[in-house]
From Swiss-Prot:
CDD domains reported for this sequence: RNAP_beta'_C, RNAP_beta'_N
Enzyme class: transferase
Subunit structure: The RNAP catalytic core consists of 2 alpha, 1 beta, 1 beta' and 1 omega subunit. When a sigma factor is associated with the core the holoenzyme is formed, which can initiate transcription.
Cofactor binding note from Swiss-Prot or TrEMBL: Binds 1 Mg(2+) ion per subunit.
Required co-factors: Mg(2+); Zn(2+)
Binding site for Zn(2+) 1: 60, 62, 75, 78
Similarity comment text for this entry: Belongs to the RNA polymerase beta' chain family.
GO biological process annotation, one example: DNA-templated transcription
GO MF annotations, alphabetized: DNA binding; DNA-directed RNA polymerase activity; magnesium ion binding; zinc ion binding
Annotated source species: Lactobacillus johnsonii (strain CNCM I-12250 / La1 / NCC 533)
Enzymatic reactions: RNA(n) + a ribonucleoside 5'-triphosphate = RNA(n+1) + diphosphate
Gene Ontology cellular component terms for the protein in this record: DNA-directed RNA polymerase complex
Protein's UniProt name: DNA-directed RNA polymerase subunit beta'
Length: 1224
């Protein structure tokens, strides 16, 4: 067996006839498959055992030799080799064709490869191959020309005139002869000479021919191999034939296609033996050609061959293509054993790293382990008995199952898996019932809820898989989201509600102003009913000596509520006491204003103090981030469980309920609506008098009703902050609902969307508390349906975008420590007008500085070069008033086929330096694709405001940028640097003319009247600046400026599209994508290299080729940067396996085989396809070739790995400590 993991690379090429015969184990001569009575394969047929191997293991066809002891013997009676039946999946046969046949891929593809080699048009070629015309092969001394086409009549005439002085043939034989005559070296030399002078169409054609001929020359493929003398027959088990219940047979379409070829081939052989008339033979040859075409690619030419029920048959090409093809269905996505799926359910009592697995499911998944253990413990005599015991569900198997699943994590996955957190590892816990139990905090990452969602469960089997699951994939490690480094495990709903209610303060609650010596004392008072969670009390600071307090107040008394005191007890002992929901309080001790001054009366202080704020959802998230930063994974995981526990408990005991009476009402809604109606009447009157157009009337009506709704909303916003209303508590805490929901409940629903995407002019003035009228209800249904359809479309679009992104960046891996580049990217805050899109702080965190950062006032170094900026450093830089910083960036990284650690910076999912081997391309694609569903589908309009151009936003804008398409609402940009000398109107042409005068030349741009001009006379513009408002076309920008400017533009535009929707994505992910789009250059002048003009080439390869030429003293090639959309970039990759499995499979493979392409197996996909371990993470050669260290001291070993059992011990110790603490 070949060991795939030793492969360096994989090459594809054209198969010569001899190669095909060497693969074959015998010729298939008859179209028979299996005998319908005996069900045995027919001799010389498509399933012949002599050719393809025995159907039963270690047994010949006639039964003379049975058993493994005869392996390798060929039976003398039936001629079948005794071997394993598995060989029927790998042994090929062949069919010797009676006439040569052209391969449809090379004749029909665009451009036609045969046509280019022979310099014949594809139309002419088709006529020859399908016997409609003769082609002159050798003109001899006649007035005919080589490769001239002759009709049947012309051929006869010339034959009569010249006799045998010329030769002309038809069919694939003629093409084959012509291909054999091609002198590649001569043709290449001639074409190179021609290129020196040729221009226009001639030049393009010459370049394309030269490209193909060069490919044949360099790859060692012969052009004549594009015409086949024999065709391979694929192994029978790959085109099976099985008997169904009713005695009928189900067979693969390929068998039908092969049978047609064999039938026609045999008929042709017979006709040739009989010396049949030429016209009959030609017809049979044409039919054979069509049969082979159908076998290779049915439907590519003419009407497809159909089977029963007029269904086109699936040919060899269809077996590879598309989602159901070999590449995507079987090689990139396999079904796996040891897996199950079930409905999910919530289980709040689980720890963060646990999940509940139903007993019967766990038993089935861990069956082999349980069987092994039963035999080991002597509870079953052998494996068979152990299996029987499990099937009977004996009582003694359950204890063993408990033991077996300890220390064996399982993987849980929820589809759609939009980012890497869609698969996480958990420690299984056996639960009754049939549903998988999930921890409530793990829902956010999976985007799961419990309304019937299902999840799949997988068991990692090998020791390496178990170790990786535990150390890399355990849910407790996945606290930060890779897209922005913010916590993804955010408490929601009840947990938020409980903690918010717990930390509220009230005036005049029982026991207000009591002062306690210690938390334990306060707990007793609460148990006795003397105080409430909301009671404001005094507490001695020295009862918590580990906590940092303000200087001089270490022994003071401070004001807090009992609820906040309880909340603080889940934090680490030495963490600050949290009294205010502010970032300040998470990083500094309690504010001094909460402390009693000597001699101050607590009641008086409480009367004069504002009530403290309760802790909302956002603050809980901030505190998780802070604890993760200070205490790392282990402690954060415990904190999350305590937070969950506290939230649920308090929420339950608080007794919060909601009823219809809790929805507030506003008294003057009717007046506001009446006022709006009056304004609408005025507008209608103006329209009837012809003062305004219908469009203006519509826009004004819409804006009147929108204003009306805003007024109502503002009134509600004021009522809503009633501190004791359960509905407002729910909204204010961030548990559920927002102001817009309340406007609809208590105010008015407002305008509804019309099916055509606009707005209906008639508003819904009622709210849900009053109830809607029938008409209003009907109007609402349009919008509701549109919402549903939009969501469905958006999901599909967003999923496809993710797939293209993953494909273009799948080979971007962290390859080295430092690429040593001296270039960097200067970043500043991204703004749109006065609106801040992305602040500088967000762009600095987690990046390396490229140059030192100086304080703009004192000129001291704040941050030296080559330092990874964390949040503290970034705050320091921003607070000093620095507006731009030069950082290391993926754009300027010099690493080939990937990025280096320094240019990438921090791994946002861990908050540490990124490691060599991290698959940052895939992470970037997931980070951009996963929030795609949150973007809107529509191209926003500006509510009818005149002047501003309609620009695309949301998902269409993101696609437009990544595909480098011409944007809608394209801006005109300046090609020169200089000043705007004049802006003139040309009424006749309906255009404006903007003139820009540069240093050397002056340019005038015609822009339509409708475009808004972005410059004024006298303005200074730099080339690449916008002259009109709109979106810049990146292809134009790269032509006028350079690749870096274009990359920066794409980055800021993508950020705008996402941040407008409130989605945060780190710059580095977009940088990885943009860099992949600009990896190629187009050759302008090849100099003295052997590159072709107009060729697309990888920047790295281009530099390497030029380096060689310069060293040998030649003239280097020149090229210009080009931008490719992600689809094009993914297809232009160096790996033909990756490209073929992405899109246009046949085109990619045709091209790759002619060029004899070599796939270096650098990316992830190509390695998955051939089954090699992927070159990311521990699969990197760097790590695979490591030797284990010898003589590691025992205590060192213990330090490096901790198991779940260790965690359990720590937890138990912590619990015991807690119990002692409360007992004190």
């Amino acid at each position: 067996m070949i060991d795939v993991n030793k492969f360096e690379s994989m090459q594809i090429g054209l198969a010569s006839p001899n190669k095909i015969r060497s693969w074959s184990y015998g010729e298939v001569k008859k179209p028979e498959t299996i005998n319908y009575r005996t069900l045995k394969p027919e001799k010389d047929g498509l399933f012949d055992e002599r050719i393809f191997g025995p159907t039963k293991d270690w047994s010949c066809a006639c039964g003379k030799y049975k058993g493994i002891r005869y392996r390798g013997i060929v039976c003398d009676r039936c001629g079948v080799e005794v071997t394993s039946a598995k060989v029927r999946r790998e042994r090929m046969g062949h069919i010797e064709l009676a006439a040569p046949v052209s391969h449809i891929w090379y004749f029909k593809g665009i451009p036609s490869r045969m046509g280019l080699v022979l310099d014949i048009s594809p139309r002419a070629l088709e006529e020859v191959i399908y016997f409609a015309a003769y082609i002159v092969i050798d003109a001899g001394d006649t007035d005919l020309e080589d490769k001239q086409l002759l009709t049947e009549a012309e051929y006869r005439e010339k034959k009569a005139k010249f006799g045998d002085r010329f030769e002309a043939k038809m069919g694939a034989e003629a093409v084959k002869e012509l291909l054999e005559q091609v002198d590649i070296d001569k043709e290449v030399h001639e074409l190179k000479e021609e290129l020196k002078t040729a221009t226009g169409q001639k030049r393009t054609r010459a370049i394309r021919r030269l490209d193909i001929l060069d490919a044949f020359k360099n790859s060692g493929n012969k052009p004549s191999w594009m015409v086949m003398d024999c065709i391979p027959v694929i192994p029978p088990d790959l085109r099976p034939m099985v008997q169904l219940d009713g005695g009928r047979f189900a067979t693969s379409d390929l068998n039908d296609l092969y049978r047609r070829v064999i039938n026609r081939n045999n008929r042709l052989k017979r006709l040739l033996d009989l010396n049949a008339p030429r016209i009959i033979v030609q017809n049979e040859k044409r039919m054979l050609q069509e049969a082979v075409d159908a076998l290779i690619d049915n439907g590519r030419r003419g009407r497809p061959v159909v089977g029963p029920g007029n269904r086109p048959l699936k040919s060899l090409s269809h077996m590879l293509k598309g989602k159901q093809g070999r590449l995507r269905q079987n090689l990139l996505g396999k079904r796996v054993d040891y897996s199950g799926r079930s409905v999910i359910d919530v289980s709040p009592e689980l720890k963060f790293y646990q999940c509940g697995v139903p007993r019967p499911m766990a038993l089935e998944l861990f069956k082999p382990f349980v069987m092994h253990e039963l035999v080991k413990r002597g509870l079953a005599s052998n494996i068979k008995n152990a299996k029987r015991k499990i099937d009977r569900e004996d009582d003694d198997i359950w204890d063993i199952l408990e033991d077996v699943i300890k220390e064996r994590p399982v993987l849980l996955n929820r589809a759609p898996t939009l980012h890497r957190l869609g698969i996480q590892a958990f420690e299984p816990v056996l639960v009754p019932g049939k549903s998988i139990r999930l921890h409530p905090l793990a829902c956010e990452a999976y985007n799961a809820d419990f309304d019937g969602d299902q999840m799949a469960i997988h068991v990692p089997l090998s020791d390496e898989a178990v170790a990786e699951s535990r150390l890399l994939m355990l849910a407790a490690h996945h606290i930060l989201a890779p897209k922005d480094g913010k916590p993804i495990v955010t408490p929601s709903q009840d947990i938020v509600l409980g903690n918010y209610w717990l930390t509220q303060a009230e005036r005049g609650r029982e026991g207000e102003g009591m002062i306690f010596d210690s938390p334990a004392e306060a707990a007793i008072a609460y148990a006795n009913g003397d105080i409430h969670y909301h009671t404001r009390i005094g507490l001695a600071a020295d009862s918590m000596p580990e906590k940092p307090w303000p200087k001089g107040y270490e022994h003071g008394i401070f004001v807090t509520t009992y609820g906040k005191l309880v909340f603080n007890q889940i934090f680490p002992k030495d963490f600050y006491y949290i009294n205010d929901p502010t970032q300040e309080n998470l990083t500094h001790p309690v504010d001094e204003r909460y402390f009693l001054q000597p001699g101050e009366d607590i009641h008086e202080k409480l009367d004069n103090m504002k009530l403290g704020q309760a802790f909302k959802k956002g603050f809980l998230s901030d505190s998780i981030a802070q604890i993760y930063k200070d205490y790392k994974v282990q402690r954060t995981s415990d904190f999350l469980d305590d937070l969950k526990e506290l939230g649920y408990t308090v929420c339950t005991t608080s007794g919060l309920t909601i009823g219809v009476e809790d929805i507030p009402t506003i008294s003057d809604k009717d007046d506001i609506v009446a006022e709006a109606r009056k304004k609408v009447d005025v507008v209608s009157k103006q329209y009837r008098r012809g003062l305004i157009t219908d469009e203006e009337r519509h826009d004004r009506v819409i804006s009147i009703w929108n204003n009306c709704k805003d007024i109502v909303q503002n009134e509600i916003a004021q009522i809503i902050h009633a501190p004791r209303n359960p509905i407002t508590i729910m909204a204010d805490s961030g548990a559920r609902g927002n102001i817009s929901n309340f406007t609809q409940l208590a105010g008015m629903r407002g305008l509804m969307a019309a099916p055509n995407g606009g707005m209906m002019e008639i508003p819904v003035t009622s709210n849900f508390r009053e109830g809607l009228s029938v008409l209003e209800m009907f109007m609402s249904t349009h919008g509701a349906r549109k919402g549903m359809t939009d969501t469905a479309l958006k999901t599909a679009n967003s999923g496809y975008l993710t797939r293209r992104l993953v494909d273009v960046a799948q080979d971007v891996i962290i390859r080295e420590e430092d690429c040593g580049t001296d270039r960097g990217l200067t970043v500043h805050a991204i703004t749109e007008g006065d609106e801040m899109i992305e602040p500088l702080f967000d762009r600095l965190v987690g990046r390396y500085t490229s140059k030192s950062v100086y304080d703009p006032e004192t000129h001291e170094v704040i941050c030296p070069a080559d330092v990874l900026m964390d949040e503290d450093m970034a705050h320091k830089i921003v607070d000093a008033g620095v507006t731009e910083v030069t950082i290391r960036s993926v754009f300027t990284c010099n690493t080939q086929h990937g990025v280096c650690k320094k240019c990438y910076g921090m791994n946002l999912a861990t908050g540490d330096d990124v490691e060599v081997g991290e698959a940052v391309g895939t992470v970037a694609a997931q980070s951009i694709g996963e929030p795609g569903t949150q973007l809107t589908m529509r191209n926003f309009h500006n509510g009818g405001v005149a002047g501003a151009a309609d620009i695309t936003q949301g998902l269409p804008r993101v696609q437009e940028l990544f595909e480098a398409r011409n944007p809608k609402g394209r801006a005109t940009i300046s090609e020169v640097t200089g000043e705007v000398t004049s802006i003139e109107e040309d009424p006749a042409e309906h255009t404006r003319q903007i003139t820009v005068k540069g240093q050397t030349d002056t340019r005038t741009y015609d822009v339509p009247y409708t475009a808004s001009v972005a410059v004024a006379e006298g303005d200074h513009v730099v080339r690449g600046d916008k002259l009109t408002l709109g979106s810049i076309d990146p292809k134009e920008l790269i032509r006028v400026r350079d690749a870096l400017t274009t990359e920066k533009y794409i980055l800021s535009e993508i950020q705008k599209a996402y941040r407008m929707q409130g989605v945060e994505i780190a710059d580095k992910h977009v940088e990885v994508m943009a860099r992949q789009m600009l990896q190629k250059v187009r050759i302008l002048d090849p100099g003295e290299t052997d590159i072709l003009p107009g060729e697309l080439m990888d920047i790295g390869e281009f530099k390497a080729r030029n380096r060689e030429v310069i060293i040998s003293g030649g003239i280097p090639a020149t090229a210009q940067s080009v931008i490719l959309g992600i689809t094009k970039a993914a297809l232009e990759t160096n790996s033909f396996l990756s490209a073929a499995s992405f899109q246009e499979t046949t085109r990619v493979l045709t091209d790759a085989s002619i060029r004899g392409k070599n796939d270096p197996l650098l990316g992830l996909k190509e390695n998955v396809i051939i089954g090699k371990i992927i070159p990311a993470g521990t699969g990197m050669p760097v790590y695979r070739e490591m030797e284990p260290k010898v003589d590691v001291p025992e205590d060192e070993k213990k330090k490096s790995v901790y198991s779940i059992a260790d965690i359990e011990k720590k937890l138990a110790a912590a619990d015991a400590e807690k119990d002692n603490g409360s007992a004190d």
